[in-house]
């Protein structure tokens, strides 16, 4: 990706995240942009549920809704669980040669699909890992997975910022509603 294409790519993702206040809608759009810009075959954004201590697919591209709903990972399990546990990105040139690759979604069925590269980066809120962004793309010996890893790390940071902003908005609204209830209660008690 050339510098001007890179700038345009990040601008488009930034615009997408800024125009949507609904998390899933904005994340699906981010995956659409990744698909068209990076020749992505499949992609997922997984989030860690800290209460259940399990990882779920929040949004996906190229994976059925049914697969998304049934697939969960434990911390440290498979590549995605390992990335979320360690907070370190992982790039696999050919998933067919990686024993840790679980293929839980069963979305990679043919031999042709096994010649895929897999890149998974953590989504961090400060120092805390809250999820992962992963991409399958056709294997190309000349393609720099490290460069793709860096691009995806920037996208993951943008996604984390978006999650934080939406969380802040939700908390502010909740605080305002509670304050409104309290003031209404005071008024009712006075009159």
Which residues are covered by each model-predicted region?
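Acidic/proline- and glycine-rich, intrinsically disordered low-complexity segments
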Residues: 66-90
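A short, aliphatic-rich beta-strand micro-motif
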Residues: 116-124
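GAF sensory/regulatory domain recognition
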Residues: 44-71, 97
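Signal-transmission linkers at sensory-effector interfaces
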Residues: 1-28, 36, 176-185
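Flexible nucleotide-interacting loop at or near the entrance of a catalytic core
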Residues: 164-191
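Signal-transmission/dimerization alpha-helices at domain junctions
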Residues: 82-89, 126, 151-170
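Signal-transducing coupling segments at domain and membrane junctions
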Residues: 65-66, 93-117
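Regulatory loop-to-helix N-cap segments in sensory/regulatory domains
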Residues: 1-2, 136-153
